[in-house]
């Protein structure tokens, strides 16, 4: 089996194509609320305080803690429906930024929408992990998810790289950029809605049973206690993330305020 040919069933293959098509457009909305993009816009257009820049940089990390909440919300429910709802709410955050004019109120909406979108994105990641575990066998999963993430990464880099030159050339085009992102997000949402999950009925029954009898489900803390390798992995991820949190906010502040650099 090659990296590209996963030898999926016909149903799963259609869903996989829908997911890949969604990754070509949905990041157009999500990238506009990334910490790096929002941080630069907030610093250059709204001249926000350093504390706000720190909040923008830290929001994605702290938003990941909401995964516990989202796993409970999605338990016993259609995973595609939950993911689509969360995607729609992220698009609403993008539209909110496009609608609000510049000024102090605009900076509040921009930062609030960014934080809300990170929490919602954590829910999408949580739900999609269940979709992937059901649709792709263990020997297929890494290849499938790597293809999806590669598409996502390429589109994210292309769009984020285009935003800087566009704002340098047209400084007042922020609203149009976010409207365009919202349209791309709606297209990605429509494509993702075509995904079907194999064996979801049995999974939902199992989740409802575990929700009624929580003592039968192994929690995250219990896994940390019993799985030494996973515990070590999480400790290293925490250390790596801590370093990333420290550097982004000061970097944005130095480049935009002290160096007075352009968007590019």
Regions found by a protein language model. Give the residues of each.
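Helix-loop boundary and gating motifs at the non-cytosolic
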Residues: 2-66, 229-264
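Glycine-rich segments within core transmembrane alpha-helices of 12-TM secondary carriers
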Residues: 63-67, 145-163
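Helix-to-loop junctions at the C-terminal end of transmembrane segments
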Residues: 66-80, 167
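Cytoplasmic membrane-interface "Motif A"-like loop-to-helix N-cap segments
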Residues: 75-88, 173
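C-terminal ends and interior cores of transmembrane alpha-helices
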Residues: 87-105, 165
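Hydrophobic core of transmembrane alpha-helices in multi-pass small-molecule transporters
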Residues: 105-124
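Symmetry-related core transmembrane helices of the 12-TM Major Facilitator Superfamily/SLC fold
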Residues: 175-194
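Helix-loop junctions on the cytosolic side of multi-pass membrane transporters
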Residues: 189-208
